[in-house]
């Protein structure tokens, strides 16, 4: 913001904004965009440690434009997930895995920017946990998660089942929940949040860019029909 240095704004965020957010119960997690030119390593660590003291879960956005060391900090602090991670080295990804940190990919960003794709299949071979999301923002106005999954399947040679796991069961482990019920799976005793497809093939949800095969959604056990 204007009239602030990165140091003064970090101090204001920690001393004024963060306590207000926690007091108002507006958040369960704190997320820092750790990137050269934005919040650096030191500022990111300071903010995240303050958030942890307030009882918030920790998340990060890292290495969208270069390998800026955010992955190392994510591993050090055992954050729940480090998103973007576009230029994070495989060595650092493995450190993140050892620290229980999920790698959250946002494929819409390289799609919109014309950048290269991360090596998803090497991640699978090394059993590094990863998720996907849309990263909807003014520079990447993609709201459709099925479209994001179709990018992985059709442009990055990712198996449809891996894409499905990335935005269901894997994603559920990165999100704080109010109860201990299972999320992200279709199983007895799990929360009944699921989509019903108008298709004979389950893979259709991520193989038809520009068209949604979802006909109905079950949200907390209640059936909601879509207008197609």
Give the role of each language-model region.
Residues 1-68:
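Metal-coordinating catalytic core of metallo-dependent amide/deamination hydrolases
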Residues 29-31, 131, 218:
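Conserved beta-strand segments that form the floor/walls of ligand-binding pockets within enzyme
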Residues 57, 67-182, 197-199, 209, ...:
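Active-site-adjacent C-terminal substructures of enzyme catalytic domains
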Residues 169, 188-228:
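C-terminal cap of metal-dependent C-N hydrolases
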């Amino acid at each position: 913001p204007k009239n602030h240095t990165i140091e003064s704004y970090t101090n204001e965020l920690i001393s004024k904004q963060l306590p207000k957010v926690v007091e108002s119960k507006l958040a369960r997690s704190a997320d820092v965009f750790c990137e050269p030119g934005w919040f650096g390593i030191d500022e990111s660590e300071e903010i995240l440690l303050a958030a942890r003291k307030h009882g918030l879960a920790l998340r990060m956005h890292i290495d969208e434009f270069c390998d800026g060391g955010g992955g190392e900090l994510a591993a050090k602090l055992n954050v729940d997930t480090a998103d973007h991670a576009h230029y994070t080295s495989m060595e650092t990804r493995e450190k993140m895995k050892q620290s229980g940190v999920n790698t959250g990919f946002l494929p819409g960003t390289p799609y919109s920017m014309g950048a290269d794709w991360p090596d998803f299949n090497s991640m699978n071979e090394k059993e590094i946990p990863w998720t996907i999301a849309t990263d909807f923002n003014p520079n990447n106005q993609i709201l459709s998660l099925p479209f994001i999954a179709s990018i992985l399947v059709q442009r990055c040679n990712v198996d449809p089942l891996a894409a499905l796991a990335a935005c269901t069961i894997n994603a559920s482990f990165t999100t704080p929940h109010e109860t201990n019920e299972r999320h992200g799976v279709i199983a007895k005793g799990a929360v009944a949040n699921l989509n019903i497809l108008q298709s004979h093939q389950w893979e259709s949800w991520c193989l038809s860019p520009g068209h949604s095969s979802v006909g109905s959604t079950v949200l907390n056990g209640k059936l909601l029909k879509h207008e197609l």
